[in-house]
Structure formats: C-alpha cells, structure tokens
C-alpha cells in the first residue's frame, strides 16, 4: 500500500484532498521538519498522522469521485432491479439534494439520520400519531421516506448518505425503462398519498424539529426517506381503483397537492405563509430548470417534490416517478453544483426575495415592500434615462432637450462671466497711497471731476496729492467703484497693533503744525519762537518745504513745531502736516481776510480730527481788524471762545512778539487735555516729513518719531525703501545717537527717497526689510502700469477736431519730494484742451545724464527747482540742445511754463477794418470793366488790401482791388477825405451808393 512506503508531498496532498501548504504548516506545528517542495518525502509516521487528521477531507474526496460517475448512471439504471451499488451512490447524492430542497433547517439532520431505519414499513403508522401532535408540513416529505426500497439500500446507506440514493434509483428506473411500464405503478400511489397527505404533512413537521434538536431519533428520518419506496407498495393495494386516474391526472395530482397546501398555509400563521412562498418559488425554479429537460414535462409541474413540506409524500416521490425524466435531471442533472444542498436551497429560501414568477401568496405577504422597491428602482431608472438623454421612444426629444439645456448652461456661464467682468471693472486695485490723478485715470474720469467731488464733500485735494486709504474709499464710492487695497502681507503693517503697558508710557512733547495763507506770518511766528531768522534764509521769503523744529518753552516743556507752506501748490504738504500732528495753529493776518488756503488748512485739520487754535497775526498794523477775522471764521463754523465757541483764539504780533507766550500756554493746555504719552522702549515708528538727495551724504530723510526710540544702526523701512541708520542730526545740525518720541530729525542711510507722508518702522532684520521693500516696489510698478493711459481713438479724434493740438513734455527735478509734488501739481493744472502738459519724470536730486537723455528722446524740457545739473549733464544738455530751466521760487517756474504754453498756442486771426469808401459815380470802360468814382470817408485804403462790397448792409462781394488810381496815376494808398478811382477784380456790378470796405487779417497772440 502507499501507506507502507515513502510518499511524495504532492501525492499525499492529492490523496488527502488537502493543500501542500496546509500539510507543511500542520506538520511543522507538530514538530516535523519538512521542506516546502512538492517532491518532498513523507514518512509513514507523517502519513499516518496526516491521514488521521484529514480523514474527513479524504472521505469527501471519495464521495466526490463517486459522484462523478453521474454519466454512467444513465447506463447503469437498467440494472435497477438488482440495485447495484452504483445506483445507491447516485441516490445518495440525489437524496442529499432532495433533503436540501426541504427547508434549510431539515437539511442538516437528515443526512446522518438515514442509517438505521430503512426496513421497518410500520414506521409510518408509528409516526402518524407523532405527526398528529406536530402538524408540521415540512416533515411530510420526511415521512414519505419510509419504503421497502430503503431495506435494499442499507448497504449503500452505510457507506454514504442513506435514503437519498434509494430515491434516485426509483426515479431512474422509470426513466430508462419503457415509460409505460414504469409509469403505471408509481402513478397509482399518487391518489393514495392524497389521502395520506393531510396525515403525513402534520407529522412531518413535528419530526423536523426533533431531527434538528436531537440526532439520536434516527427513526424519524428513515421514515422520511423510506416512504419513497412505500409508494409502490401502497399503489399495489390501490392499483385497481385509481390506476386510470393516475395516468390521466398526473398533473392533477400535483395540482391538487398544491391546492391543499396553499389554502392551508394561507390560513396558517406566518410560518405557513413562508412555506407557501418556498413552494411557489420552487415552482418558478422548476420552470427555470425545465430548459434542461426540454422534451419532458416541465419540472414546474411538480413543485411540491423539492418542497420538503411533505404534506403529500407522493408529491416529491411521484414527481420523481411521473416526471422521472425532468426531476432527476432538474436536480441531479448538474449534481456537482447543487450537491451541497445548493440546488434545492437556491429556488427556496435564498432566492425567496428575488423570485421572479407571479406568486399570489408571496405578493400578499410582502406586497408593500417589494412593490415599493420596484417603483423606486423604476423611478431611478427613468430619472437616469432622462439625465443621460437615452431612451428609444423619446430619444430625439431627449437629445434635443439635452442640447437645449447645454446651450442654456453655456449662456448662463457666459452671463456669469460678463457679470464677473463688470464687477471687476468696477473694482479698483490700488496701494494704500495713490495720487488723485492716478485715481482719476483708474476710474477713467477727469481729474477735475474728482476734485469737484472732493470739494463738494469738504475735501481739498490737488492733482498729485497722495490720498490715504480712507479718502480713496470715499472718492471711489462716489463714482461707484469698489476699492481693493493691495498689501504685501501682515508683516509689513507699520501700525502699532500691540497695546503698550501703561506703566511703560511717559509724557511726550506735543506736535504742533502751523498752517495758514501765504504771507500771513507763519514762519515769522516760528522764527520768533525759535529766536532765529528762518525767513531771511528762504527764497522769496516763502516756505517751500515742511520744516520740523523742536523748541523748549520758557516753562521748560518741549514742543515740536511743523511749519507748512501756505502756497496753494503745497496742499499735499499741509494735508500731511495735519495728519501727523496733535494740535494745529491756524495763522490769519488781521489786516487781510480768511483766504482760500486758510479755509483749506481748516478743512485739513478737521479731517485729521485734531484740535485747532486760531492765531490772529499782525495786530500791530494800523489796518488790523481782529473782529472782522473772527466774523469770517464764524462763517466757516469756527467760533472762538470770545464769541462763545470752543476754539481758543490769541491775537499776536510775530514781529513784536506780542501774545506769543500766551499762545504757547494755550498750546500746552490743549496738550495736557490730550494726555499725550508714548512708550520709548519699543522699536521706533513714525512718519516721513521730507526726503531729499544730498550729493555728499546721499539720501537724507526728515522723519518724526511718534513712538519708541530710534538709534544709530537700526534697520528702518520707509515706504518702498529701507536701509540702516548711519547718522542722525536734529534741525540745528547737532548729531544724535538716539531719538525718542515726538523728536524731529534727519536720517541718513536709506537706499532711496521715500515719499513724504510714508510711515517708517524699525525692522528686526535686514532680510525682512528687503523682502517687504521689494514687494512694495512691485506693487508700485504694477499700479503705475495700470494708471498709465495710452492714446485712444476718441482722443485722436478730439485732437484732430481741434486741429492744432500740442503736447508739452516736462521733466521735473526738485530738492525735496514735497516740492516735486507741489510743482508737478501746479504744472498739470495748466493743461488746456489744445495743449496738454505731460510730466514724463519727476524726482529728487540734481539733474543727471539720464534725465538729459530722456529729455532728448521725448522732446521735453527740464524744470529744476532749487537743484542744478551735474557737470557732465550740463555738457550733454548743450550737446543735445536740451533746455534746462532752473528756479528757486515756485511762482517763477509756474509763470514761465505758462508763457511757454501761450507761445505754443496757434495765434488767433482777427479781421481789422482799415478804411471805408463811398461810391459816388460809376464809369463803364471798354476792355476794363466798371470803374467806381469813390470817396474815402474813413481810414486808409491800400492797394493790396482785401475789400468787400456792401449794398444796403448786405455783403455783395469780397475780393481784392484790381486798380487804385488818383487822377491818372496809380497809387498805393488813398487816405481819408480823398477821392479815387477803384475797380474790383472779377466784379463789375458796382452801383452808386455802394460802400467798399477795406480790411486785413491780423494774427493775435492768444493767452491761457
């Protein structure tokens, strides 16, 4: 034997029906050492251990091999009389399936139970009382199993599952034998089972639970399978009575069984209803398998056969008898698949919810759930079909609808895009500071409209004045635009967000700004306070930049003064001065009145929200009238304390020093009320007052420290420029090492000139300052690109309509940034419809070669304000023939540019009447024409003058003189009160009484 010798691993695995890996793992777990190789040797001990361990698996393999003989079963059926072992083997397989056809509960117990009780035929009688107790339909099939055939099958039952093979043998015999012979005997038992049906149905069900709960009562199960053989025995007794009916009523027998079961189960509780469902589904399943049995009676005719209800013991067996062909083939035709009870179960319990056939009982039991689910599925399918545009009936309609929906969606998307573009068109992307002219160009409106809107709102702005975020928002809102401020991120915010510890705050000096009209004595007042001669050093005696000074009063308290220009060109400077100040002093001359710049200064102070003190100057002059000034101020809603208002007022004389100390006391009083404090221990922050370029020192920035302490070596960031503080000096030129709050000073070390009004702050690292500076430069470049306007067709048409449009290109250079702004504003205001001023470039510092080259390329003139060109730039300008105009007073620069513009204007042609001639007689001369004898009544008539003939006040002819004679001599002119002869070129219809008027066209210089 194979067991006595060494075997290979693959052979053992095949024999035991187990995988090699399973064998190796099992042996390894038991301590055997074996290689994972199909050719590895298995010792006798190993094999004995494995065969004992996997005995069941080997048994299954044997059974499977026996099952494969199904093909021989067809030929072996002829020997059914002897009941060869082959038949029992098939019967076993079939019986397993039949038992499985019964409810799933009964399947498991039936297989083991079949061994003992095949011979006893009296078992059915003993079971009937038990059945009466139980009334269970499912085990009716089991009761039917008690038949003599079981005795013959004892041997086969012992080897495998017992009763099942017997059934199949009985079924197979009629299949191969002549159908008439075999069919007759089994048909007879069907009527008898009808009578027994009620009896067997009830006991069968009762036995089923017993079989399930207890394996020892094997007697019950043999009863189930032996009754199959009982069928021939019972028919033998009743053959004469119902043989004919059996033949004729094969279907009726099945139908009757179904009728009996269906009503009983409907009346029975839910459990019975479920069995009915199983029956119905088995019927449907039979019909489905009928395809294999094609020629024979449809398997669906005996659905009760697979049905384990057993109410009709003949039901399942007769089904095997009558539809012998169909049933064995239906169930056993493919035994391999359904052998593990899958065949019967499939049509039964598992498939119950998915059964397709029409089942009245099933429909009633689960009508709501299934119908609802189906409806839901239908709805979902219909909806999906609509969405996908599919369908056969309405395909074209759906496709058309889909195209329509698609077009609609595209139209909606396009509309949304246009709406977004319109919204973007109404959105301005600006930095926090932008000039009024740039803002106007972004909004595509005239700068005059912007200025007029601002004046209507009480804001005084100039063309190049830099507007802050609040002003930009207000102005843009007036024109219907939304403002989107572009910043470089949170890290570049110079606002001091952190709250200072109150314990670290100290008193600081008040920052006082002196504002007022030109020549009203602002600088003289500051001069007296500083005990110096500031005015004497100023060009033209007017202030042209913001001066910042720190003054110590007689009481020992410091005050920081800012002196602003009063000229209208310095509007932006005054606005900046009001923003960084604590208190504003408005200076008004007592011998003058409240002037436009005075009103503007008052407005700036109000916008900044700072307290105002009125100083009425020049009261020592004879024409001084302080009451008149107070009255005019009241018209501007400035009511002084003397008149019951809230504004302090002091009459002073800056020259004589009258009232100066009282004025300072009032300033200190306001400062005390404001409780001005600052933290000197943090990094410094402040504002840029002015910036200039010094040839020897580089960029010099005037700053005012608002909080913290600025020290030499600090990294500061101001606008788009940064640098390390190299030196600091105060207004007197004294070098400082550090500067505390409210201290004005000059700082050296920035890499550029920041714009006046920019905030500065001390950064931790130079890298951080450089990154933020580069981001700000990028924003400014983007903004300048957006604000740059190119010529449009409308503009070209406008210029052509004017006919003589001209453009004046100017490059502005000045000593400080504030002067650059003021001069640029003033020059831009000179633009007219015919002549447009273009500021190509403006900057701080001396004139360089690059400025000359730019002027040469663009045909521009250079206006220099308090700066001079370098030596190389001067030589290049002479070579390129570029005109450089240098000024020290802003008035002179403005006036000369205005004159240049007037020179660019086309002269206006005017008609001048030189003389009048009265026609007193008319002579017609051959070959000459008509000659008029005339008298010069007024003026002088010259030979080359143009003339017009006037008759009754109507001009009849305009032309030139053909001949002018006095007596016989041709003359060049005829004066008043002289007679002459005159003929007109190309006109002979001269009549007595006509007037001839001599005139000429003259060019008249135009003015702006």
From Swiss-Prot:
Predominant cellular place of this UniProt entry's protein: cytoplasm
Signal peptide: none
Molecular function via GO: GTP binding; GTPase activity; translation initiation factor activity
Region (Disordered): 113-136, 153-235, 253-405
Keywords: Cytoplasm, GTP-binding, Initiation factor, Nucleotide-binding, Protein biosynthesis
Extent of Basic and acidic residues compositional bias: 153-180, 189-213, 365-381
Region of interest (G3), residue spans: 563-566
Homology family: Belongs to the TRAFAC class translation factor GTPase superfamily. Classic translation factor GTPase family. IF-2 subfamily.
Designated name of the protein: Translation initiation factor IF-2
Annotated organism of origin: Cytophaga hutchinsonii (strain ATCC 33406 / DSM 1761 / CIP 103989 / NBRC 15051 / NCIMB 9469 / D465)
Lineage: Bacteria, Pseudomonadati, Bacteroidota, Cytophagia, Cytophagales
């Amino acid at each position: 034997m194979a067991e006595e010798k060494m075997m290979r691993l693959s052979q053992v695995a095949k024999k035991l029906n187990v995988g090699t890996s399973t064998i190796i793992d099992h042996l390894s777990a038991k301590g055997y050492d074996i290689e994972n190789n199909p050719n590895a040797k298995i010792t006798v001990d190993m094999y004995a251990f494995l065969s004992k361990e996997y005995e069941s698996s080997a048994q299954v393999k044997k059974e499977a091999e026996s099952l494969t003989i199904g093909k021989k079963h067809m030929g072996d059926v002829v020997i059914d009389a002897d009941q060869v072992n082959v038949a029992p083997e098939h019967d076993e397989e079939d019986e397993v399936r039949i038992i499985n056809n019964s409810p799933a509960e009964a399947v498991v117990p039936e297989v083991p139970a079949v061994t003992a009780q095949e011979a006893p035929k009296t078992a059915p009688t003993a079971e009937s009382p038990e059945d009466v107790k139980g009334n269970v339909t499912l085990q009716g099939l089991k009761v039917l199993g008690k038949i003599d055939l079981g005795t013959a099958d004892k041997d086969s039952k012992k080897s495998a599952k017992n009763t099942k093979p017997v059934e199949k043998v009985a079924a197979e015999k009629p299949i191969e034998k002549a159908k008439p012979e075999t069919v007759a005997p089994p048909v007879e038992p069907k009527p008898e089972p009808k009578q027994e049906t009620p009896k067997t149905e009830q006991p069968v069900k009762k036995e089923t639970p017993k079989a399930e709960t207890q394996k020892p009562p094997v007697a019950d199960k043999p009863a189930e399978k032996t009754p199959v053989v009982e069928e021939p025995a019972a028919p033998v007794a009743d053959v004469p009575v119902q043989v004919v009916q059996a033949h004729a009523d094969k279907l009726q027998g099945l139908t009757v069984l179904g009728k009996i079961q269906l009503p009983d189960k409907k009346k029975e509780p839910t459990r019975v209803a479920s069995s009915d469902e199983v029956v119905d589904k088995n019927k449907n399943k039979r019909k489905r398998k009928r395809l294999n049995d094609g020629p024979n009676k449809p398997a669906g005719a005996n659905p009760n056969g697979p049905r384990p209800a057993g109410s009709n013991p003949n039901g399942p067996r007769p089904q095997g008898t009558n539809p012998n062909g169909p049933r064995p083939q239906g169930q056993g035709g493919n035994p391999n698949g359904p052998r593990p009870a899958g065949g019967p179960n499939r049509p039964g319990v598992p498939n119950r919810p998915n059964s397709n056939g029409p089942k009245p009982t099933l429909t009633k039991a689960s009508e709501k759930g299934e119908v609802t689910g189906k409806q839901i599925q239908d709805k979902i399918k219909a909806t999906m079909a609509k969405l996908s545009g599919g369908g056969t009936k309405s395909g074209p309609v759906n496709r058309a609808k889909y195209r329509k929906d698609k077009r609609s969606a595209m139209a909606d998307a396009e509309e949304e895009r246009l709406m977004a573009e319109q919204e973007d068109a109404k959105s301005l992307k600006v930095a926090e500071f932008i000039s009024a002219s740039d803002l106007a160009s972004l909004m595509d409106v005239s700068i005059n409209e912007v200025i007029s809107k601002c004046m209507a709102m009480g804001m005084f702005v100039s063309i190049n004045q830099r507007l802050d975020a609040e002003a930009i928002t207000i102005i843009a809102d007036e024109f219907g635009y939304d403002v989107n401020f572009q910043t470089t991120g949170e890290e570049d915010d110079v606002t001091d967000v952190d709250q200072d510890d109150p314990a670290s705050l100290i008193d600081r000096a008040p920052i006082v700004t002196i504002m007022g009209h030109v020549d009203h004595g602002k600088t003289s007042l500051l001069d007296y306070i500083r005990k110096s001669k500031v005015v004497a050093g100023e060009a033209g005696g007017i202030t042209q930049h913001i001066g910042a000074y720190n003054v110590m009063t007689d009481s020992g308290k410091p005050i920081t003064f800012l002196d602003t220009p009063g000229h209208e060109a310095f509007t932006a400077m005054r606005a900046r001065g009001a923003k960084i100040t604590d208190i504003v002093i408005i200076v008004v001359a007592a011998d003058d009145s409240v002037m436009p710049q005075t009103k503007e200064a008052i407005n700036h102070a109000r916008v900044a929200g700072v307290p105002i003190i009125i100083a009425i100057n020049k009261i020592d002059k004879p024409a001084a009238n302080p009451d008149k000034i107070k009255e005019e101020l009241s018209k501007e809603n400035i009511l002084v304390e003397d008149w019951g208002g809230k504004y302090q007022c002091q009459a002073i004389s800056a020259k004589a020093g009258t009232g100066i100390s009282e004025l300072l006391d009032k300033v200190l009083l306001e400062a005390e009320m404001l409780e001005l404090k600052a933290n000197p221990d943090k990094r410094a922050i402040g504002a840029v007052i002015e910036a200039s370029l010094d040839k020897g020192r580089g960029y010099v920035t005037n700053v005012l420290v608002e909080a913290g302490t600025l020290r030499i070596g600090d990294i500061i960031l101001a606008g788009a420029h940064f640098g390390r503080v190299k030196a600091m000096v105060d207004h007197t030129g004294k070098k400082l090492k550090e500067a505390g709050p409210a201290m004005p000073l000059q700082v050296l070390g920035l890499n550029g000139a920041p714009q006046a009004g920019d905030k500065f702050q001390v950064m931790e690292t130079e890298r951080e300052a450089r990154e933020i500076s580069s981001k700000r430069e990028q924003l400014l470049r983007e903004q300048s690109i957006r604000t740059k306007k190119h010529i449009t067709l409308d503009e070209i048409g406008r210029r052509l309509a004017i006919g003589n449009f001209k453009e004046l290109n100017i490059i502005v250079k000045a000593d400080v940034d504030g002067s650059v702004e003021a001069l640029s504003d003033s020059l831009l205001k000179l633009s007219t419809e015919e002549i447009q001023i273009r500021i190509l470039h403006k900057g701080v510092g001396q004139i360089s070669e690059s400025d000359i080259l730019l002027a040469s390329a663009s045909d521009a003139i250079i206006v220099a304000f308090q700066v001079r060109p370098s030596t190389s730039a001067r030589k290049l300008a002479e070579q390129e023939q570029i005109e450089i105009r240098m000024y020290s007073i802003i008035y002179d620069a403005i006036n000369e540019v205005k004159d240049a513009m007037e020179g660019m204007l086309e002269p206006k042609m005017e008609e001048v009447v030189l003389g009048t001639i009265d026609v007193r007689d008319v002579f017609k001369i051959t070959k000459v024409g008509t000659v008029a004898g005339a008298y010069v009544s007024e003026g002088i008539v010259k030979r080359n003058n143009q003339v017009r003939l006037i008759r009754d006040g109507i001009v009849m002819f305009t032309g030139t003189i053909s001949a002018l004679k006095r007596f016989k001599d041709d003359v060049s002119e005829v004066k008043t009160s002289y007679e002459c002869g005159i003929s007109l070129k190309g006109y002979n219809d001269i009549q007595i009484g006509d007037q001839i008027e001599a005139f000429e066209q003259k060019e008249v210089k135009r003015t702006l």
